[in-house]
From Swiss-Prot:
The keyword Lipid biosynthesis does not apply. InterPro entries: Insulin, Insulin-like, Insulin-like_sf, Insulin_CS, Insulin_family. SMART domains: IlGF. Insulin decreases blood glucose concentration. It increases cell permeability to monosaccharides, amino acids and fatty acids. It accelerates glycolysis, the pentose phosphate cycle, and glycogen synthesis in liver. Residues 1-24 form the signal peptide. GO terms for cellular component: extracellular space. One of its GO terms (biological process) is glucose metabolic process. Residues 57-87 form a propeptide. Its main location: secreted. Disulfide bonds join C31-C96, C43-C109, C95-C100. This is Insulin. It comes from Felis catus. It is found in: Secreted.
């Protein structure tokens, strides 16, 4: 009997023993420290974009002042311009309130 025919049953058993590849990261909710850890994992040495909440609020207030016409050359928009609901599209809304993928997380890398 040829030597390769003896190896055939062994190869068949080995192929059954090797686990099928699974997705290491499925789309999931990531909040708080889990979100930060996932960003470190995805971005590595590049780091990721982060704006502290206090800084964002200050920038939002400056933007609202400009919309109301308090900034020079703003054109004097009426307060009704602020009545439309603001749409949040940050990483927390994308990955904590909803699910996100590694590909979506990668958009926040530097």
């Amino acid at each position: 009997m040829a030597p390769w025919t003896r190896l055939l049953p062994l190869l068949a058993l080995l192929s059954l023993w090797i686990p099928a590849p699974t997705r290491a990261f499925v789309n999931q909710h990531l909040c708080g420290s889990h979100l930060v850890e996932a960003l470190y994992l995805v971005c590595g040495e590049r780091g990721f974009f982060y704006t502290p909440k206090a800084r964002r609020e200050a920038e939002d207030l400056q933007g609202k002042d400009a919309e109301l016409g308090e900034a020079p050359g703003a054109g004097g928009l009426q307060p009704s311009a602020l009545e439309a609901p603001l749409q949040k599209r940050g990483i927390v809304e994308q990955c904590c309130a909803s699910v996100c993928s590694l590909y979506q997380l990668e958009h926040y890398c530097n």
